[in-house]
Amino acid sequence: MPRKPQQPRAHATVGAIVEAGFISLARNGVENTTTRHIADIAGVRVGSLYEYFANKEEVFDAMHEHMVREVVGMVRPLIPTLVRMDIRELVAELLYRFRDLLERDDGRYLRYMSYAAYFAPRGQIEPINRLLMDLLMKYVMHHPQLVRLGNLPAMGFIMINGGVFTVIRYLTEPNPTVTFDDLVRGLGDMVAHFVDGELQRAGSAD
């Protein structure tokens, strides 16, 4: 039965296996990634991998937890700055940061995210959802006129997830027809136009 790492050396081994999982996934895809591929890239015996993971799916789970920590670690320190930005600046900052994270280390995180929807444990995404809702609520506190928007949590969820999917789709396109800067401006305009329109509608109803 796989065990949890206790000693620093064991933690280092598990970390190497998880990083190797990202590399193997980028090279071989989901179906063709095997525990042997992962172990070889990590520089450990397959038996050592099985000390901590029962199969490649458990490695994928650990990769997802790692990715969630990376996203949370990227966004959380930015919140005090993000909440003071206007809508377009906020969208641009988040999208550029997200792109930089995905393209780091030869794009291994990008390849993972392009597959993640197929096998990522849904419950493990909750820390990101909580963080983004916290960002949304704090943003509204700094921009109290937004309280008048109807169904704000639902629209925030749709726009955040839609933006993430759009960035991943763009970055995995071999020959995109627009620049990333244009994409960011377009998404920022879409969110800003929605907010402005809803605020005008709310004002007309008063």
Q: What spans do the regions from the language model cover?
A:
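N-terminal intrinsically disordered/low-complexity leader segments
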Residues: 1-12, 23, 199-206
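Short glycine/proline-centered loop/turn elements that form peptide/ligand docking sites
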Residues: 1-6, 23, 32-34, 42, ...
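Helix-turn-helix
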Residues: 12, 16, 24-58, 62
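Short hydrophobic clusters on alpha-helical segments that form packing/core surfaces
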Residues: 17, 21-25, 71, 98, ...
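Alpha-helical DNA-contacting segments of helix-turn-helix folds
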Residues: 60-67, 112, 128, 132
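Amphipathic alpha-helical packing segments from all-alpha helical-bundle domains
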Residues: 69-76, 89-96, 100-107, 120-145, ...
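Short linear capping/connector segments at secondary-structure termini
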Residues: 76-81, 111-120
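Hydrophobic/aromatic-rich alpha-helical bundle segments in the mid-to-C-terminal region
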Residues: 110-114, 122, 142-190, 201-206
